[in-house]
Amino acid sequence: MRVVIALGGNALLKRGEPMTAEVQRQNIKIAAEAIAPIAAEHQIVVTHGNGPQVGLLALQGSAYKPEEAYPLDILGAETEGMIGYMLEQELGNVLPFEVPLATILTMVEVDGNDPGFQNPTKFVGPVYDASEAGELHQQKGWVFKQDGNKWRRVVASPIPRRIFELRPIQWLLDKGAVVICAGGGGIPTMYERGKERTLIGVEAVIDKDLCSALLARDIEADLLILATDAEAVFTGWGTPERKAIFKTNPRRLGEFSFPAGSMGPKVEAACHFVNATGRVAAIGALADIPAMVRAERGTIISSSFSDITWHVEVPIPGPASRPV
């Protein structure tokens, strides 16, 4: 079976943790241990978030003069190399030596007329209090939006249209490699207006879940797993009536609304993939990845399900909850 596993930002850096290399390495080690059992039996592609990392590099780059600072597309490429290296190393420490690993810098085409450029929504970088965010807005012109009780920088997040490195990814998979690619949604690029053969970088960050769904569709994956810090997709989140969805179809899932900055993009990406391919998507906790492959944990989304079944209790990492 061919599986795309999209690691949420929590797989690399949990909220409130310092953005140090050692902290990220420890989190990536946990992710590698969850992925390894799947890689031993299936063809695996791993994608990952990079919001905190690309934001940190942008903050470091602010020491440059504005005209000398590196743009977001280059910072995104840097994070793909950095995180890909750490994932390769930790996966290599738990997989058999003969399993090849490869990280691919992945350029992704976007449309210069995408409405996302007019309404920045993608969180990048660390959290700030209101006064710090205000100062940075005045100094650098950055746009901020509230994220919980803090503030974070937001940038444009255009829809991914095409993955340029698709063929090399497929070649490596066919040779048995575990492929790490499309980190942070890939490097946003487009053809320069009036120059059909000139590819240029774009100051934006692509949603990694939507890019993972596009990748999974194009490589004909059997399963798309979106790993996050929640054990399943919940209705009534934050209320006493919250319930965890076990199995459902895209139509029924579309009847609910989910937060735009967290679960919303994952649900949208999962439904896109299922509707486009007729295959299966799963959303759940990082530790539950092996159980999601077996359709025992998380929220499993398939057009073959006629309605919704619920986890009897809030699922926690471990044996699957019994469905209603």
Curated annotation (Swiss-Prot):
Catalytic activity, EC: 2.7.2.2
GO cellular component: cytosol
Subcellular location: Cytoplasm
GO BP annotation list: arginine deiminase pathway
Pathway: Amino-acid degradation; L-arginine degradation via ADI pathway
Statement: the UniProt record of this protein carries the keyword S-adenosyl-L-methionine: no
UniProt catalytic activity: hydrogencarbonate + NH4(+) + ATP = carbamoyl phosphate + ADP + H2O + H(+)
Transmembrane segments: none
One Pfam entry name: AA_kinase
Class in the EC hierarchy, top level: transferase
Molecular function in Gene Ontology: ATP binding; carbamate kinase activity
Main location: cytoplasm
SUPFAM superfamilies: Carbamate kinase-like
Alphabetical UniProt keywords: Arginine metabolism, ATP-binding, Cytoplasm, Kinase, Nucleotide-binding, Plasmid, Transferase
Homology family: Belongs to the carbamate kinase family.
Protein's recorded name: Carbamate kinase
Organism: Rhizobium meliloti (strain 1021)
